[in-house]
A protein has these predicted regions:
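Cationic, low-complexity basic patches in intrinsically disordered or flexible, solvent-exposed regions
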Residues: 6, 24
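Short, Lys/Arg-enriched N-terminal segments with co-localized hydrophobic residues
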Residues: 25-39
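Charged, gly/pro-rich active-site loop segments
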Residues: 37-39, 121-182
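A short, Trp-centered hydrophobic/proline-enriched beta-strand micro-motif
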Residues: 50-66, 106-110
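A generic structural signal for short beta-strands and their flanking turns/coil linkers
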Residues: 56, 70-72, 82-84, 102-106, ...
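A short mixed-secondary-structure module that forms the rim of ligand-binding clefts
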Residues: 77-116
Length: 182
């Protein structure tokens, strides 16, 4: 929806549509014209991977034991060559691990510099998480920056590698939005 100020036509907000029009406190939201709508496209994973290369932080969303959604920032630790699978290190005793053990369906949110109508990109990923406790796998995804968080490196007691395999990905970049072919 495009929300315009009465009698001026100035756009004051852009939001998800809720119907043909909504009025509140003198503002009227109307469905956008064809020129104001997002451009729906499909991109390949390689297209999106290039744009995601500089994004280190993702928001990992899990299902809690009471049915709520829990979110936390997770670092890619320099392992950002996106191929549909993401890896994150954490500790065994975290809520994220408990949530994934109960329900492996997760979501990831990525955002680069920029605003909604600038050159930044936003990517939402839905997928299935797997908990890996194998030291050989740790070594494949380990970077020296992780030593700041895990004092004994891959030998730190209680570390877990979270692997998220994407089943669906959506992106927004300026006026362009769409699904990613996985």
């Amino acid at each position: 929806m495009i929300i315009r100020k009465p009698n001026s036509g100035n756009v004051v907000a852009v939001c998800a549509p809720t119907g043909p029009h909504v009025e509140h406190d003198g503002l009227r939201a109307v469905a956008p014209s064809l020129t104001e709508r997002q451009i729906m496209t499909r991109k390949t994973l390689a297209d999106i991977a290039d744009e995601m290369a500089g994004i280190d932080i993702a928001i990992l969303s899990t299902h809690t034991d009471n049915g709520e959604i829990a979110n936390r920032p997770m670092s890619n630790n320099g392992d950002v060559t996106y191929d549909g699978t993401s890896y994150y290190f954490t500790y065994e005793q975290t809520r994220a691990v408990a949530d994934i053990q109960r329900n492996p369906k997760v979501a990831l949110g990525f955002s680069s510099e920029g605003g909604i109508f600038s050159d930044g990109i936003y990517v939402a990923v839905e997928g299935t998480a797997e908990l890996i406790r194998d030291k050989a796998a740790f070594q494949q995804h380990w970077t020296s920056d992780l030593d700041n968080w895990f004092e004994k490196g891959v030998d730190t007691p209680g570390i877990v590698l979270i692997k998220v395999k994407a089943s669906r990905a959506t992106y927004w970049k300026g006026r362009e939005e769409g699904e990613v072919d996985l």
